[in-house]
């Protein structure tokens, strides 16, 4: 197919948009692939839509290859199914909610577990119908608080979501692994550099969960990897190795000290070293010897609130994402002055485990706060701390929580090396959901023995529209976009760089020849200057550019590789065959 630039609905820009923060956003707007309509909402123009459709085609082909069947469910969904699973509340402000003229509540679908479960329940009733995998490629909606980075994080986006239904856990694992392998083929075909990491399930529920993260310095997700073993996990999913229990018998009793003006960890450490505590330790006291107690308020889905104490080693900050993932579906809030006033035993800067437990405050600690570990921490009185407080003797936590930050050099949970932090963009997420949704809607079939069998689900998502931005993010250079052949809007971009009639006639011949070979050709037949055409060719990013200019009179054309920047002159008579050979390998 031939598309003439003189007829294409396209306007390129020379300057970056004022609101653009990352390269993909800047280039996709400048190159005329997308246009902003509202915060987090974008129009797809012809070139952008061609890339999007090609990504969809790759995803669709691989889903079909594992037996997936494509359907399309509505984006406008009733409230009731989401009330049944409690996600009407759990999703909080990220749901777009609306009501019809009769006052009935609806939402714009962020994901479709409920509807797929109900669809299978309505159609299947026998074990003979299973297993089945259904999928859709559809626009989703989430009311992001801070949409950013163009189509990387929008309020409206295209997603492939698929759902497997099996008779037992072995079947679920097989479906999960089939999707995992399909995702690897998809991302490999799209030319994306990615890593698979262990992840949390969040509001989706279920057990096993993995994310596919595209390597990118602009990614919002932090993950860690152990180069020695290959272990990788989203930072929210990292499990802190717990120390071996230490003996308690015969250990010195904890001692309360006057520690005036020491409300911070730094001031407490300074006091400890000046007061001779270092001699007791046989080394200088560090922040890692202190126990920091952070107070938060959890707001549960039923609206009830709970004050909780979080104990972490003093050399660690609380990671908001890890804390949030650990307490989902509850939301985390900071305590207000009114909360402290209502609970006078909470002495700012001097909070310790004792007062929390005496007053019925749930106290969760970092796994490093193991049995027999000794700490310097608050004594629940202004200007007082306790030294040598031993976990399991002087206080007993209500449980552990993964809330402390993960740092470079931390031991890997598999015990085979140390962790290194990196950033990535989530492009896929797969879940073994289990029975959360089939239990909620009683999705049963008759088993081989004539008794009901509850189906078990898996859920698998790919950010299809996000993939366009991810590819642009990973593949661009200082001149513009560089599309891999699998998703490029056109196979080849032909530029007429000479107003000579013979060159234009020759270009028409070359373009016709490429078209006859089944290639998609973008033909720059405009009367613009060669400089403008070359800049646009670099900005638009087709993998191959054919330049027909002064060399035509000498019987040559120039072939440019957009990825390598290499250019070669080839005989005009062989131009079509050479281009086809380069493209098809």
Curated annotation (Swiss-Prot):
- Pfam families from the xrefs? HGTP_anticodon (PF03129), tRNA-synt_2b (PF00587), tRNA_edit (PF04073)
Q: What is its EC number?
A: 6.1.1.15
Cell location: Cytoplasm
- Keywords recorded for this protein, A-Z: Aminoacyl-tRNA synthetase, ATP-binding, Cytoplasm, Ligase, Nucleotide-binding, Protein biosynthesis
Instruction: For this entry, list what GO says about its biological process.
Output: prolyl-tRNA aminoacylation
Q: GO terms for CC?
A: cytosol
The membrane spanning regions, by residue number, are none
User: This protein's superkingdom?
Assistant: Bacteria
> Would the keyword Ligase turn up in this protein's UniProt record?
yes
Molecular function terms, GO-annotated: aminoacyl-tRNA deacylase activity; ATP binding; proline-tRNA ligase activity
- Catalytic activity, reaction form: tRNA(Pro) + L-proline + ATP = L-prolyl-tRNA(Pro) + AMP + diphosphate
EC class, as a word, reads ligase
Assembly: Homodimer.
Q: What is known of its domains?
A: Consists of three domains: the N-terminal catalytic domain, the editing domain and the C-terminal anticodon-binding domain.
Summarizing the function annotation, the protein's role is: Catalyzes the attachment of proline to tRNA(Pro) in a two-step reaction: proline is first activated by ATP to form Pro-AMP and then transferred to the acceptor end of tRNA(Pro). As ProRS can inadvertently accommodate and process non-cognate amino acids such as alanine and cysteine, to avoid such errors it has two additional distinct editing activities against alanine. One activity is designated as 'pretransfer' editing and involves the tRNA(Pro)-independent hydrolysis of activated Ala-AMP.
The name under which this protein is listed is: Proline--tRNA ligase
């Amino acid at each position: 197919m031939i598309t003439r630039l003189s007829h294409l609905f396209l306007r390129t820009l020379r300057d970056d948009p004022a609101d653009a923060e990352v390269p993909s956003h800047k280039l996709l707007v400048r190159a005329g692939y997308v246009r902003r309509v509202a915060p987090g909402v974008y129009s797809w123009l012809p070139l952008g839509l061609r890339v999007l459709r090609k990504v969809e085609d790759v995803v669709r082909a691989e889903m079909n290859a594992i037996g997936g069947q494509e359907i399309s469910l509505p984006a406008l969904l009733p409230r009731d199914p989401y009330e049944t699973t409690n996600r009407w509340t759990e999703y909080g402000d990220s749901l777009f909610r609306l009501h019809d003229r009769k006052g009935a509540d609806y939402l714009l679908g962020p994901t479709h577990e409920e509807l797929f479960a109900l669809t299978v329940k309505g159609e299947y009733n026998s074990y003979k119908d299973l297993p089945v995998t259904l999928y859709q490629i559809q626009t989703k909606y989430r009311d992001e608080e801070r949409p950013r980075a163009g189509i990387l994080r929008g309020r409206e986006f295209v997603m492939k979501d698929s759902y497997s239904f099996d008779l037992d856990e072995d079947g679920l694992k097989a479906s999960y692994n089939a999707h995992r392998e399909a995702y690897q083929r998809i991302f490999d075909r799209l030319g994306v550099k990615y890593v698979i990491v262990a992840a949390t399930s969040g509001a989706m529920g279920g057990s096993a969960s993995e994310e596919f993260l595209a390597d990118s310095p602009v990614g919002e997700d932090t993950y860690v990897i152990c180069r020695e073993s290959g272990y990788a996990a989203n930072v929210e999913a990292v499990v802190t190795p717990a120390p071996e229990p230490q003996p308690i018998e015969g250990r010195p009793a904890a001692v309360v000290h006057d520690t005036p003006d020491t409300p911070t960890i730094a001031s407490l450490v300074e006091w400890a070293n000046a007061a001779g505590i270092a001699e007791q330790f046989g080394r200088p006291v560090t922040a890692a010897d202190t126990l920091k107690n952070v107070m938060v308020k959890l707001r549960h889905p039923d609206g009830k609130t709970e004050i909780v104490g979080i104990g972490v080693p003093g050399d660690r900050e609380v990671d908001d994402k890890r804390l949030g993932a650990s307490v989902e579906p509850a939301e985390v809030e900071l305590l207000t002055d009114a909360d402290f006033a209502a609970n006078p035993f909470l002495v700012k800067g001097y909070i310790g485990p004792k007062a929390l437990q005496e007053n019925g405050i749930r106290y969760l600690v970092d796994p490093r706060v193991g049995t027999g570990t000794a700490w310097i921490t608050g004594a629940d009185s202004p200007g007082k701390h306790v030294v040598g407080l031993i976990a399991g003797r002087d206080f007993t936590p209500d449980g552990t929580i993964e809330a402390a930050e993960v740092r470079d050099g931390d031991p890997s949970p598999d015990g085979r090396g140390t962790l290194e932090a990196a950033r990535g963009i989530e492009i896929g997420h797969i879940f073994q959901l289990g029975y959360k949704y089939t239990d909620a809607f009683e999705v049963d079939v008759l088993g081989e023995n004539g008794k009901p069998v509850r189906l078990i689900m898996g859920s698998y998502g790919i950010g299809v529209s996000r993939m366009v931005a991810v590819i642009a993010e990973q593949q661009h250079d200082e001149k513009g976009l560089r599309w891999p052949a699998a998703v490029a809007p056109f196979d080849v971009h032909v530029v007429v760089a000479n107003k000579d009639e013979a060159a234009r006639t020759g270009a028409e011949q070359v373009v016709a020849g490429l078209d006859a070979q089944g290639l998609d050709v973008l033909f720059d037949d405009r009367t613009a200057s060669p400089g403008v055409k070359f800049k646009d060719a670099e900005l638009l990013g087709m993998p191959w550019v054919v330049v027909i200019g002064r060399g035509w009179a000498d019987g040559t054309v120039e072939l440019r590789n957009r990825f390598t920047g290499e250019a070669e002159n080839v005989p005009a008579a062989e131009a079509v065959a050479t281009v086809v050979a380069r493209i098809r390998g």
